[in-house]
């Protein structure tokens, strides 16, 4: 009898959602690791190419304004065809990871060709969703760029609150699109409907998960430092290689956990919304 991990039988607490994410992660890690490994390597292709050509990984100009520097760096990346190719590969493989996790968590047999074919088929919808979601969030913080100096950062700090609300409301859009096959706009609307009224609940979940991932990367950094001391003997090239490989391994493991958490959150919100809708339908005749 297959072990059904999705959807949960009832609405869950924050701890139970994280536990569900870890159970999905453990059950699917080995079968998702090839996708995650290729995705992590693909994500590093622009940096590897620049290193091979002797180009600096970061822009050479001084950082006088952090926000402008980040924006200029992002615009520079978007002009790089290799960055677009790497981003498309990462997007497809990320979608394939969630689709495979959903298949395993629901107790159905998996097939690599099906996962990848579905991910590629839904790529246009995912890209449209990411663009629309990014614009919906960015429109709240763009006014900060009209100011300069400390006023820019003060306004940005104030605008982060509504931007965060929009980001959380749309956070389930990508999983919804992949699992249900809805279009980009329909997935965004469905995500907003699912997350409505659960802002603090989701904020706590994402915050705890972020702390766990930061702790994982910190531990990996310590391990890389120890290995560098033992193996490098002061050789900067060896230190860089050991650190890079360690971080890539951690990223390869962290990527499936990210998607397992997204799936666990989607399952909980779906059960919550279905329960609320059922309660509303049952109470409707009594109020008439």
Where do the protein language model's features map onto the residues?
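Long, highly hydrophobic alpha-helical transmembrane signal-anchor segments
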Residues: 50-76, 117-156, 234
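Solvent-exposed, amphipathic alpha-helical "stalk/arm" or coiled-coil-like segments used as scaffolds
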Residues: 86-98, 125-126, 133, 258
């Amino acid at each position: 009898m297959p072990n059904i991990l999705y959807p949960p039988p009832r609405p869950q607490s924050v701890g139970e959602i994280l536990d569900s994410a870890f159970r999905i992660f453990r059950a699917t890690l080995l079968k998702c690791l090839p996708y995650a490994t290729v995705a992590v390597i693909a994500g590093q292709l622009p940096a590897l190419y620049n290193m091979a050509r002797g180009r600096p990984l970061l822009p050479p100009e001084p950082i006088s304004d952090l926000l402008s520097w980040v924006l200029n760096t992002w615009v520079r990346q978007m002009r790089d065809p290799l960055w677009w190719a790497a981003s498309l590969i990462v997007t497809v493989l990320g979608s394939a990871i969630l689709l495979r996790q959903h298949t395993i968590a629901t107790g159905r047999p998996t097939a690599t060709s099906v996962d990848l074919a579905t991910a590629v088929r839904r790529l246009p919808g995912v890209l449209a969703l990411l663009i629309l979601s990014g614009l919906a969030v960015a429109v709240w913080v763009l006014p900060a760029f009209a100011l300069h100096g400390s006023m820019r950062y003060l306004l940005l700090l104030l605008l982060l609150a509504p931007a965060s609300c929009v980001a959380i409301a749309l956070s389930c859009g990508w999983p919804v699109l992949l699992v249900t096959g809805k279009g980009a706009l329909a997935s965004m609307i469905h995500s907003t409907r699912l997350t409505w009224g659960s802002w603090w609940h989701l904020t706590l979940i994402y915050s705890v998960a972020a702390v766990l991932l930061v702790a994982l990367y910190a531990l990996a950094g310590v391990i890389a430092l120890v290995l560098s001391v033992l193996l490098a003997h002061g050789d900067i090239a060896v230190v860089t290689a050991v650190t890079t490989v360690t971080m890539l391994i951690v990223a390869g493991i962290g990527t499936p956990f990210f998607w397992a958490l997204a799936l666990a959150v989607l399952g909980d919100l779906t059960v919550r919304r279905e329960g609320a809708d059922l309660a509303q339908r049952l109470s409707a005749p009594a109020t008439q």
